[in-house]
Amino acid sequence: MNLKKVFILLFLVLAALWAGAQDQSYADCLTKTASKWGAPCAKCEYYKDMYKRDYSGTYQIDLQNVCSDMIEVKVAMEEKNGTWRTFPIKALGPKETMNAFACQGTGKYMYWVRRVNDTEILLPSDQEILTEYRSR
């Protein structure tokens, strides 16, 4: 009889662990690996003295998928004028990185993460981000 209780207890513990693994927060899979202020950015065209490119306000981050699952990521970077520069949803495999930037950044950024092909989690659209987080 005691052996039966042990097996039931073991089964319940394994079921709980398996259920917990299913509810993993994929936001924990994305880690900032680097950030840079004032580094050249080919996509930023801000000039001073009418002709010199000025990168002094650029803020760039590198984000890496540290999990073994493929994830989809949506990133937004805040510009000094209070708007958010959004980036298309990007799929990242294990150990893959992505770069995001703000040409006149504040240092604030946001990201949303889900497992690839997860239809239950909806990532926000650019319009939702621009409307919801305006001047925050």
Placement of each model-derived feature along the sequence:
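Hydrophobic h-region of N-terminal signal peptides that target proteins for export
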Residues: 11-20
